[in-house]
């Protein structure tokens, strides 16, 4: 039996349920009688840790079978919040500016708030279903609800979602680590050496850092690394905000051959060269002055100055640097999947819940509320200021867009290092639920084995390395996985498990009507988003896109 299942979850009545008082009173009696019989085994546990998530239906034999698993959680409220926040944050934050560019500011904010609220509601359904269903393992909830098909459905969804998440982290390493190494070595461009090849680098990082961290036995050990990862992401958001006020619009494009910047414009305009105030930067910025000449220069002098500087310039459209509030195009299809992918933490909710100290459903819901709200604020800031920096020129991986502007910039170099460290330390967190799913499916009653523990981690990491090397752009990871498995985990599975396993509420109760509406919304969203993405692939195939 998996150690994450049925570990002393509080069974206080649900305040949200009008039928909360209907929980069997006989449960307390059963719990007390069994507690007396096993008092020596649970001598060091508090009263709550001796209650089992069984709804009073387990007999003495099953209680005895579960006895070894019923030990209290040891992870603090703060560490649990760090772990869940880190699971939410991931690399989705790097794709949000791209989503805003293809939805507009107002539409993006509405969608972001809606997805955050729906994610909170989904966690509420999942936690309540875990209590009523008697398991803290996603696959076993599926098995109790629909038998073997439900177990397989949960397994496939968790595996696809977390493999997509791991792949997106490795994509960041593939794209950003060569740029960091190139900057440290003072190279103006990638020379093609093996140590600047992202495919080689992700293999080295996977074997040297990710695999050893993935061999830890418990998820709680990663609480401190989660806190450090979040600190790195806070630093990332801070620098994105700071750079918004340094990079002018229209976007300066670095000409590596002469060390200057050029604009993508077509008509003459007046520009003034401004030094970049960032330390050790090899870049000069150009500001657009369309209504006056550079100070002290007449028209001919200005033109001569521009000719001598080697700057290429063209006029830009009037609205190129104007923010868009509502945007609808073929890329809008990727916006909602990217947002959904950014808020997925559901495979980690139950493992974190199982390790929460003095756990209760309400306490875990508070952890979820704090984590999702905090990430909502960080997402909004990163998306808004990233979009207002690059507007329509933003890329699907935000940090990669800055390479258009800088050859070397100390704050951005530090940001890239921070993000690389953060995503590298996050990979083991999303690997844990996949390994648990594999063990639950293939080795449900086997004792713990270090060899199996190692081999599953090694195979998963190897498969992700192959995927990252073969898939050309990160957007298709975010879009397709977000539209399929992420919607299963956020919308569909929690709703159907709730409808099936929560017996004490009638089907016409407000709680189940809400879950049914939630299920229908999830189905329509998944079908619609995947259809739009497939249509976009047909008419604008991936090989024709350059990022």
From Swiss-Prot:
Ranges annotated as spanning the membrane: 105-125, 152-172, 196-216, 221-241, 333-353, 370-390, 412-432, 454-474, 477-497, 515-535
GO molecular function: alanine:sodium symporter activity; amino acid transmembrane transporter activity; amino acid:sodium symporter activity; L-amino acid transmembrane transporter activity; L-arginine transmembrane transporter activity; neutral L-amino acid:sodium symporter activity
Activity at various pH: Optimum pH is 7.5-8.5.
Gene Ontology BP annotations: amino acid transmembrane transport; amino acid transport; L-alanine import across plasma membrane; neutral amino acid transport
Cellular component aspect of the GO annotation: microvillus membrane; plasma membrane
Superkingdom to which the source organism belongs: Eukaryota
Tissues in which the protein is found: Expressed almost exclusively in embryonic and adult liver, and at lower levels in the kidney. Expressed at lower levels in adult muscle and pancreas. Detected in fetal blood vessels. Expressed in syncytiotrophoblas of placenta during first trimester and at term. Highly expressed in first trimester placenta compared to term placenta.
Key words, A-Z: Amino-acid transport, Cell membrane, Cell projection, Disulfide bond, Glycoprotein, Ion transport, Membrane, Phosphoprotein, Sodium, Sodium transport, Symport, Transmembrane, Transmembrane helix, Transport
Reaction catalyzed: L-methionine(in) + Na(+)(in) = L-methionine(out) + Na(+)(out); L-asparagine(in) + Na(+)(in) = L-asparagine(out) + Na(+)(out); L-threonine(in) + Na(+)(in) = L-threonine(out) + Na(+)(out); L-serine(in) + Na(+)(in) = L-serine(out) + Na(+)(out)
Disulfide topology: 249-321
Annotated InterPro entries: AA_transpt_TM
Phosphoserine modification, residue list: 49
Intracellular or extracellular location(s): Cell membrane; Cell projection, Microvillus membrane
Residues annotated as glycosylated: 260, 264, 276
Principal subcellular localization: membrane
Extracellular-side segments: 1-104, 173-195, 242-332, 391-411, 475-476, 536-547
Residues in the Cytoplasmic compartment per record: 126-151, 217-220, 354-369, 433-453, 498-514
Protein purpose: Symporter that cotransports neutral amino acids and sodium ions from the extraccellular to the intracellular side of the cell membrane. The transport is electrogenic, pH dependent and partially tolerates substitution of Na(+) by Li(+). Preferentially transports smaller amino acids, such as glycine, L-alanine, L-serine, L-asparagine and L-threonine, followed by L-cysteine, L-histidine, L-proline and L-glutamine and L-methionine.
Family the entry assigns: Belongs to the amino acid/polyamine transporter 2 family.
Name used for this protein in its record: Sodium-coupled neutral amino acid transporter 4
Species this protein is from: Homo sapiens (Human)
